[in-house]
């Protein structure tokens, strides 16, 4: 895919940069030695003039290495910090990271005019060029409430009705995808797992956000999936070039990587039709109302300044990107963990069978506590993001310990490093499926799950029980007032994907030792080419 081509060439550039870096280090070391041994003098003026720029070049190359080594650089800096705030240099700015909840809460409490989530997101996604000229303000006021109310109240409340339809669609989708894989022996088929998961998340989200018609439109779904990839490519290129080139280059790239435009045009037609349907209902025509995010956003649109078609489409595209991107990579990592720990699979199958999908639907997807704990432990050890609570500094900001951050830089927390801290987590580097399960729930599960014993599967420490959607000890969903309001839907959708896969199919990795992830900046992505063996179960 085009992303692989881009990353391959970026890797070649990094190799060339590495060679330059070695030469730069050697020369800057010479400069350091001159200054240390002789100090500045007239005799050294020539060397200072020649070599001083190389010190700057060395720093820039080190910052560029963050592109492909971001998580490792953050981890190394975290281990040296002893709990204090620490900083890492990136090609565009400095990131100041914190790793304790006191300072994380200080980030959350800061005014949005000082530390801005939207300004950081705008820098990452370049929405003016990737999302059809969507202009974000650095500070969102009350006009952002329609989307928040839609996701937190309307979508979460509709889950008991929505989840059975999503599961039905996904069962059909997985069967179709299985048929397209190459058969290797006796009904066993082989293929790449990530495209399957990405397609499942896209279809699920399209149903919830846009309604069943667009969710079953292959052309729309293809554009929606490509839009994720194209957004990342365009935004990353624009972040790497001087701002004076961003407008012409952004137009050039978006005209060629045009899946965002295809998606925008389809959503514009759909939202426009919804407005016409509303007018017709006012005139007495019997046109049924839809139950999806388009309709609910229209319901909650500000009365004093109603959102029009363009604003609604832009909001839908933004939430589409975030939800598909994060959920697909998270679900894929969980599947990798199931393949690494096949002893967990039968336990989770029995939990799904004992609980039943009907009870799951009625709960809005908020039960299956064993699977919930498995998903949380998977995300703890294999997060797809190294940072959270990401904010761009708009005004000088100081933490309570005196650490100052200047405008243009970012402040973030470091959850990936924090989640492996042995001072916080017992057996921090080990995968324990029941780490987040309450003891009484595990004790009850032993009454209906065969092979489940406290000797074989233990809770490594008391007091860590919590659900996947909790925020008290967890940063996957963001922090405090800026946390993800769609997390109840996302959690339920991932449970359906995992539950359907393990109850209907046997799955294992073709090469369990092959590399599965690569990093770019702070993100960690699964390789799209990782192969699985997949076979339909007899009782499915």
Predicted regions: what they are:
Residues 1-12, 522-540:
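C-terminal helix/juxtamembrane-tail motif
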Residues 2-142:
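N-terminal membrane-proximal hinge/A-helix region immediately C-terminal to the signal-anchor transmembrane segment
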Residues 65-75, 358-403, 407-423, 464-465:
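Conserved cytochrome P450 K-helix E-x-x-R motif and the immediately C-terminal K′/meander segment
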Residues 90-92, 101-104, 108-191, 195-210:
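Charged/polar low-complexity intrinsically disordered regions
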Residues 98, 107, 325-350:
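Classical protein tyrosine phosphatase
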Residues 162-329:
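Cytochrome P450 heme-thiolate monooxygenase catalytic core
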Residues 344, 469-476, 481, 487-523:
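Cytochrome P450 heme-binding "Cys pocket" and the immediately downstream C-terminal segment
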Residues 413-464:
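Conserved cytochrome P450 K-helix/beta-meander segment immediately N-terminal to the heme-binding cysteine loop
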